[in-house]
């Protein structure tokens, strides 16, 4: 297999860099700093001598400032997967030797090669791209001729003009790295908006061999045995038995496309923070690689918790107490908010209504989903909002909860993310860790679909949290006002399986043709209905207080 790839805006990412250079070099004023690359280009072209300004800016970005360009998320994984399968990869770029109007004569090609070298493209122990497989062309015709000469099976480019060029080889599959352009149907082009999508398109699922290669690349340890573990809704986990006879957890995170927060960065730094504050019933960090979105941790031996008991609950309370105590440490202030933190009633309502809107956007494909949302969920939600805003303490209705009443939270806390050892529970999964309202932690623990707490356990947990956070005079009132809200929120979370991004990430509809997908979606819808019924019961109890 031979795969050809364009360079600029396909491998190298310049979105932020164009705006930063435009600001520093005086092309734009600070009030335009929120522009993206396309908006910046369009703005400059409308100015006097705008096309010249745009070409000058391109020359600066691709030359003098090339070292500040980013690597496209997911590309490193893709390249390593090619290596595992012995696929030949070629970079073919339309890049002149020097930039337009560049009086300093900076070689654009030399800067591109330096950038690839600094990103370890040519390191045989890492990305392992051959230097001789990088080609620069003076014009588009020469680029297309090189693609034809190489006889690529696939070529990936962000510019449709490459594929519509008269000389483009007809047997080469065309992949446009964009979802914003269209090419006439006779050119038989496939559209993919990110490297994860291209990865899925060409390779399908990540293999154990892929993860073993990544593990060796960042640890310098060989892999004796690797096993993929059952996944939840988040990252992929692998158990690695290494050549040093130690066992590790290799966690493969979603890439950072669409400016998503790095889950790797959040989890790895959070665990390091907890370790530094003497929290021991967690995994330990080993090494991470943000280019590969790969974190390596100590493997935690033990059993999953199928049925919790009172001792488990007490250990969960103790862990929350530890987090609350270290929230007061001086270095805790440098941690960010938990993912989807809810620091006010307005935050919570806004999050739920955004989820409603996302699900409503796909109801043309799912009549049963539309009927549920329109006939059952939304009317109940509207009743809740009208009531709960009056019941919610005014101090955190619209404004954020005061910092002294916030706590550090895993934000996905429960026995589904704990391992039982002989003498203790070890808590895992800190991808969403950060500052939050302890009311959210309390309510999520009770509402999470994996918890299944009975009435007695729920009452014990609720009372323990009220006692723990008793310094907050509004904690109990806020909890009672918000509990139905959080139940409704979970009713929407279980419906994520209807969303296209979930389907793409978990490869449901494209791989299942046996009716199991429809069965699974029906099951999630039934869970959502159960949440609504439970919320109505809980809501009636709140109103009667």
Protein language model annotation of sequence segments:
Residues 1-53:
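Active-site neighborhood of HAD-like aspartate-dependent phosphohydrolases
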Residues 492-545:
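ATP/Mg2+ or Mg2+-diphosphate-binding catalytic cores
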Residues 227-230, 234-353:
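ATP-binding pocket architecture of kinase catalytic cores
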Residues 438-473, 484-504:
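Active-site activation/catalytic loop segments of kinase-like enzymes and analogous catalytic loops
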Residues 227-250, 389-442:
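Active-site acidic catalytic loop and adjacent metal/ATP-binding pocket
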Residues 210-222, 328-411, 475, 537, ...:
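An alpha-helical support segment within catalytic cores of ATP-dependent transferases
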Residues 104-210:
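C-terminal cap/substrate-recognition subdomain and adjoining C-terminal extension
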Residues 66, 70, 75-116, 134-137:
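Substrate-recognition element of Asp-dependent hydrolases with the DxDx(T/V) motif
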């Amino acid at each position: 297999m031979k795969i050809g790839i364009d360079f600029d805006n396909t491998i190298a990412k310049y979105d932020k860099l164009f705006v930063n250079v435009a600001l520093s070099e005086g092309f734009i004023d600070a009030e335009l700093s929120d522009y993206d690359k396309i908006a910046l280009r369009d703005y400059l072209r409308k100015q006097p001598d705008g096309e010249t300004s745009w070409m000058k800016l391109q020359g600066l970005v691709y030359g003098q400032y090339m070292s500040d360009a980013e690597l496209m998320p997911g590309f490193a994984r893709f390249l390593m997967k090619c290596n595992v399968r012995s696929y030949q990869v070629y970079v073919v770029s339309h890049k002149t030797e020097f930039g337009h109007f560049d009086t300093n004569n900076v070689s654009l090609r030399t800067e591109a090669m330096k950038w690839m070298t600094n990103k370890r493209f040519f390191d045989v122990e890492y990305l392992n791209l051959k230097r001789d497989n990088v080609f620069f062309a003076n014009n588009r015709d020469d680029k297309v001729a090189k693609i034809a000469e190489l006889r690529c099976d696939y070529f990936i480019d962000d510019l449709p003009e490459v594929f519509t060029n008269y000389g483009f080889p007809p047997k080469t599959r065309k992949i446009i790295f964009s979802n914003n352009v269209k090419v006439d149907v006779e050119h038989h082009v496939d559209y993919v908006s990110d490297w994860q999508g291209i990865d899925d398109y060409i390779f399908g699922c990540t293999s154990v061999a892929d993860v073993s290669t990544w593990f060796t690349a960042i640890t310098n340890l060989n892999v004796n045995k690797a096993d993929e573990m059952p996944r939840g809704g988040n990252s992929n986990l692998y158990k690695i038995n290494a050549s040093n006879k130690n066992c590790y957890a290799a966690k493969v995170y979603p890439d950072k496309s669409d400016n998503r927060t790095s889950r790797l960065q959040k989890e790895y730094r959070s665990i390091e923070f907890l370790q530094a504050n003497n929290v021991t019933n967690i995994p330990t960090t080993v090494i991470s690689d943000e280019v590969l979105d790969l974190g390596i941790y100590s493997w935690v031996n033990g059993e999953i918790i199928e049925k919790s008991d009172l001792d488990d609950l007490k250990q969960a309370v103790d862990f929350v107490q530890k987090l609350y105590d270290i929230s007061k440490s001086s270095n805790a202030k440098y941690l960010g908010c938990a993912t989807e933190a809810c620091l006010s009633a307005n935050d919570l309502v806004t999050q739920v209504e955004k989820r409603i809107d996302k699900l409503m956007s796909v109801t043309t494909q799912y009549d049963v989903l539309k009927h549920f949302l329109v006939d059952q969920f939304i009317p109940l939600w509207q009743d809740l909002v009208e009531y709960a805003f009056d019941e919610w303490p005014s101090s955190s209705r619209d404004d954020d909860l005061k910092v002294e009443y916030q706590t550090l939270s895993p934000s996905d806390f429960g026995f589904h993310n704990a391992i039982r050892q002989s003498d203790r529970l070890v808590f895992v999964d800190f991808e969403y860790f950060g500052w939050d309202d302890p009311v959210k932690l309390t309510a999520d623990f009770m509402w999470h679909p994996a918890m299944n707490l009975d009435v007695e356990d729920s009452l014990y947990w609720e009372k323990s949290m009220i006692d723990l956070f008793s310094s907050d005079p509004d904690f109990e009132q806020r909890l009672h006002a918000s509990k139905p809200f959080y139940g409704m929120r979970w009713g929407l979370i279980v419906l994520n399986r209807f969303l296209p991004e979930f389907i793409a990430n978990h490869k449901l509809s494209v791989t299942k043709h046996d009716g199991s997908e429809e069965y699974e979606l029906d099951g999630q819808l039934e869970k959502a209905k159960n949440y609504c019924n439970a919320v109505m019961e809980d809501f009636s109890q709140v109103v009667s207080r």
